[in-house]
Design a protein with these regions (language model features):
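Generic beta-strand/beta-sheet core signal
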Residues: 11-13, 45-46, 153
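Flexible loop/turn segments at secondary-structure boundaries
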Residues: 15-19, 50-54, 145-146, 158-159, ...
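Substrate-binding cleft of secreted/luminal carbohydrate-active enzymes
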Residues: 19-85
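Short beta-strands within extracellular/lumenal beta-sheet-rich domains
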Residues: 112-128, 180-181
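Extended extracellular/luminal ectodomain segments enriched in beta-structured repeat modules
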Residues: 127-137
Length: 228
């Protein structure tokens, strides 16, 4: 055979580390879309088991927006960009946890000094020029109370939405002193490819350490467009 092409498959094993947030349906979509949009030939679903616990049925977390239990229906979505387009999903940066001797390529945890700025980049694989999400939500976790100003691709964040933390089940595994925040970003600011999030610490005296950053793309209700 003259075909020397070697297919490359992305593995989802990074989302199974015990210290990380328990993986959710929306996070799996974001992971797979990220990999496929970067040119992967497919996705290897590591430890993606359908247990007797739920028998393949949906099991949502408090708030009814998030599902953290794998089920067979997701196999119809995760292997193709076409089936992932227009579905609710979450993109996130690695927390920087080290397991099995691996060093994640991530800016987190990120320390921002008082009244200083920092930037991080989040890759989005969705073709947002043709199908734009109805709502764009940024979730971030800090090691202490924080007062941040945020911009996405130069567009300022719209408003804090504290109730989203519980609605989307983002308060899990909080350690002593850690805080979880949610803020709406302008959906028009989102683009396919790298998105620059600029972060400013508004505090005049204390540094802030950002432990987790997640970007949720909401195209519609969880019932019709998928759970987060």
């Amino acid at each position: 055979r003259n075909d020397l092409r070697v297919p490359v498959y992305a593995s989802t094993d990074m989302v199974t580390y015990q210290e990380n947030e328990p993986v959710s349906e929306g996070m799996m979509r974001g992971f797979c879309m990220h990999a496929l949009a970067q040119g992967a030939d497919g996705v290897y679903l590591f430890n993606y088991f359908f247990n007797d616990y739920n028998r393949g049925r949906y099991h949502t977390e408090p708030g009814e927006q998030t599902c953290r239990v794998p089920h067979p229906r997701m196999l119809h979505e995760l292997g193709s960009r076409e089936t992932l387009e227009g579905r609710n999903k979450i993109y996130w940066l690695s927390d920087g946890k080290r397991e099995y001797g691996l060093r994640p390529n991530t800016p987190l945890p990120l320390c921002v000094q008082p009244q200083q700025q920092a930037e991080v980049s989040l890759f989005v694989g969705d073709r947002v020029d043709s199908i734009r999400p109805k709502e764009l939500i940024l979730f971030y976790r800090t090691r202490q109370p924080a007062s941040l100003r945020l911009w996405l691709n130069g567009k300022k964040a719209m408003k804090m939405v504290p109730d989203y933390v519980s609605i989307y089940n983002k308060g899990v595994k909080l350690q002593n002193g850690e805080q979880q925040y949610a803020v709406r970003l302008p959906a028009k600011a989102l683009k396919q490819g790298d998105n620059v999030l600029r972060i400013e610490n508004a505090d005049t005296a204390s540094e802030v350490t950002i432990k987790r950053i997640e970007l949720a793309l909401k195209y519609g209700s969880a019932d019709t467009h998928g759970y987060f």
